[in-house]
Regions:
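Short, well-ordered beta-strand segments in beta-rich or mixed alpha/beta enzyme
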Residues: 19, 69-84, 170-175, 210-233
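Secondary-structure boundary elements
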Residues: 84-87, 98-101, 195
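Short, glycine- and small/hydrophobic-rich beta-strand elements in well-ordered beta-sheets
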Residues: 5, 47-74, 101-116, 192-215, ...
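Short S/T/G/P-rich N-terminal loop/turn motif that feeds into the first structured element of a domain
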Residues: 1-52, 83-87, 112-192, 221, ...
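Short amphipathic alpha-helices in soluble, non-transmembrane regions
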Residues: 90-97, 228-234
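A short acidic (Asp/Glu
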Residues: 76, 89-91, 120
Length: 268
């Protein structure tokens, strides 16, 4: 029996872009009312189209959502789910052509892809391939692994290409797995990592795409849920020992139909 790989198989779905902006309120308030109204209407129409996403039967949702950032880290967060990086780039360029764009200063962004780690399935698939006499890394091995994951991919399509939840609040944060001298997530045996990963779920992977390894989006109608969930995670071994967390961004949903309220400072 050859030594089995320690790298779990993963499934990838929607490409995800977070854009964080500051809004130039000083310049905005200097505009005549009719110009502000026209710019607001233009952006509202664009956002409504992005919110609706793909309406074709059997297509991926491919939606976007706007959130009003709470605190000093920014004013607005746009989240985009799309099938490809090219589609995300088209969204960026489309936004750049709007009359609203000169009032937006992008302070940060985060690029990732929806990821499901197949820890338990990987061990079974690797064992089955080894029993057939296949060697890890060979074309036959890779083809066998691809066939096995393709079946799982089809059954998990709704999780890999999700619609944006309609919840009122968003909590977004990036995170890494520790690789210190005494604690290194990646040197733990895959069976041990699988056991620990049952305690939480990573939503989007960004290794090779952005500065952190994963990005996590939490949606809820009660923001206290975020506090309770993250506090509970502190007691999970996978988080307490191996996780490094980045900044947390908390925001409130702004629908296209309510964008005028946001511009007027009356968002409920």
């Amino acid at each position: 029996m050859p030594e089995l790989p320690q790298v779990p198989l993963t499934l990838e779905g929607s490409n995800v872009l977070h854009q964080i902006f500051r809004f130039d309120w000083t310049a905005w308030k200097k505009l005549p009312l009719d110009e502000r109204t026209a710019i607001s209407a233009e952006f509202s129409a664009l956002l409504a189209r992005w919110e609706a996403g793909n309406t074709e039967p059997n297509g991926h949702p491919n939606q976007s959502a706007l959130f009003s950032q709470i605190g000093h880290k920014g004013d607005l967060i746009l989240i985009h789910f799309r099938d490809s990086l090219e589609d995300l780039n088209r969204v960026e360029l489309e936004l750049a052509q709007t009359s609203l764009y000169p009032f937006l200063q992008q302070t940060s962004s985060y690029l990732s892809v929806v990821e499901l780690g197949l820890y338990e399935s990987s061990e079974k698939i690797y064992a089955q391939l080894a029993e057939k006499g296949l060697e890890p890394g060979t074309p036959e091995w890779n083809a066998g692994a691809g066939e096995a994951t393709a079946r799982t991919f089809a059954s998990l399509s709704s999780r890999l290409f999700p619609a944006i939840p309609p919840a009122k609040y968003l909590c977004f944060y990036p995170m890494d797995r520790k690789r210190g001298e005494q604690v290194n997530w990646y040197t733990e045996p895959m069976a041990d990592r699988r056991t620990m990963m049952h305690e939480r779920q990573i939503i989007t992977g960004s290794i090779g795409l952005d500065d952190w390894e994963w990005g996590v989006d939490l949606f809820a109608d009660d923001p206290i849920i975020f506090k309770k969930l993250i506090y509970e995670m502190r007691f999970d071994k996978v988080s307490a020992v191996y996780a490094s967390f980045g900044q947390f961004f908390l925001s409130v949903r702004v629908h296209a139909a309510n964008i005028n309220q946001w511009f007027d400072g009356t968002l409920a």
